[in-house]
Each structure stands twice: as structure tokens, then as C-alpha cells.
């Protein structure tokens, strides 16, 4: 845990993370109104589409943008307590650290939500390093085994004012994301889940129901499983693309820093 915090802070505050993290900087301004261009103003401010419509030059007026609200929502599931390189839940802890420190670096408020069939953890918005460390600890120490979420999280999140939302899970369930927030989907997986090895007959524990399962992980069973996962994942990708959600799939063997930097630039 301590190593995770130190590593994340070094990447964020050591100037490695994103001089171009536009998600955290916003565009610096809020749109207020349209008005006619005044002679002598910077011509770069002219909105040419609107000017063409009204046949005279117009500019958009903006106000300085207030601080952003950053919400990280982890969709709780027992399947997050799995990993061949490291647990998916440990990867999520690192992601929360990176996003949290990035938020306060740009003087924004950060809060963490862990959701099952109701919010089980929802931290107060913070702009302090201690607040971020506390949020990371809540994820790191959380017991995901035997847990699962339902789709009521959408209504819960829509109760809050418009924010930048990071939705984190392994998405074996595919919710309809009718969210009013600027939403980024972080899809957490382990390579073994999508490409398991043959193990023959084996006893497993369902991480959601905690029931014991006796199964045969032979070649045919694995091929069926892979096809089913590929089919559902393809459907989810098509949905995210259709609805224009920005998303990144991050595996447990990967460094999330680079995936996040690419997503948020």
C-alpha cells in the first residue's frame, strides 16, 4: 500500500503525468452567451458558424470555469478479487491513487464511490493528499468477495451535479449508462480470464455467490467460454462506441499510468 502511494505520487507530481490531461483541466471556461463582435477585438474569437448564420460577426462570451468535481465509482463485484499477476482490486487501488492525485494537482475536488445495490462507501469531496490516501485505503482494504452490484448506481450518480465520472469495473454485466456526467469507462481485466489454460477437472469457488463449482476446464469448455466472453465484450464495445463514451481496457499486468495518460490527453 505504501509503495503504491509513493509510486503514484511520483508519477503525478514528478511531472510525468500529463501536461496534457485535458479531462482535469477542462477548457478553463464556461459558456455564457453569444454577442456581436466589437471592432478591435481579437478576430480569433469570432465564431464563424454563428456569424454565417446571422450574416455578421459574432463571438461567444465565456466565464472562468470553476473547479471540477471528479468522482471515481467502483462497481463492486467478487470477480474483482482475481488476478494472475496481481488482483484486479489492487490495480483499481492504483488507478484511484493516480486519478486522485491528478485531481488535486489541478485543484479539483475528488470523491470515491464503491457501489453494490446501494452506495457502501462514498467519501466526502477532498482536495488534500490525506483525503486521497484515505480513499485509496478504502479500496485497498475493501472485501469484494461475495459482492455484486445492480444498475441502480445510474440513478444514484445522476442525483449529483454534473461532474467528471470514472466508472471502474470488469463489466461482465453490461449496464445502460444513461448518465448526465462526462463519463470515462475503465474496464479492468486479467489476461487469464480471457485466455484461460487447460486445467482438466477442477473445483472452483464462485467469487460472487461463494458457492463451490466442480467443472472440467478442457479445451472444448475453454473455447466455449472464450467465445462467450468475446461476444459479450464486443457488444459492450459497440455500445460504448455508439454512445461515444471514452474508455480504456486495462489488464492487471499493465501499468495503468500509460493507459490513463493516453485516455485523458
Predicted regions and their residues:
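A short, compositionally biased
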Residues: 109-110, 136, 196-200
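Conserved beta-strand segments of the P-loop GTPase G domain that flank and frequently precede/overlap
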Residues: 73, 167-169, 185-188
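Structural motif
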Residues: 168-172, 252
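Von Willebrand factor type A / integrin I
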Residues: 1-25, 33, 159-162, 177-265
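Short acidic, S/G/P-rich loop/turn micro-motifs used as interaction or catalytic elements
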Residues: 79-80, 172-176, 192-193
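An amphipathic, basic-hydrophobic helix/alpha-beta surface used to engage anionic
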Residues: 1-123, 164-166, 241
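Von Willebrand factor
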Residues: 128-163, 173-174, 190
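Short, electropositive alpha-helical surface patch
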Residues: 122-137, 238-245, 265
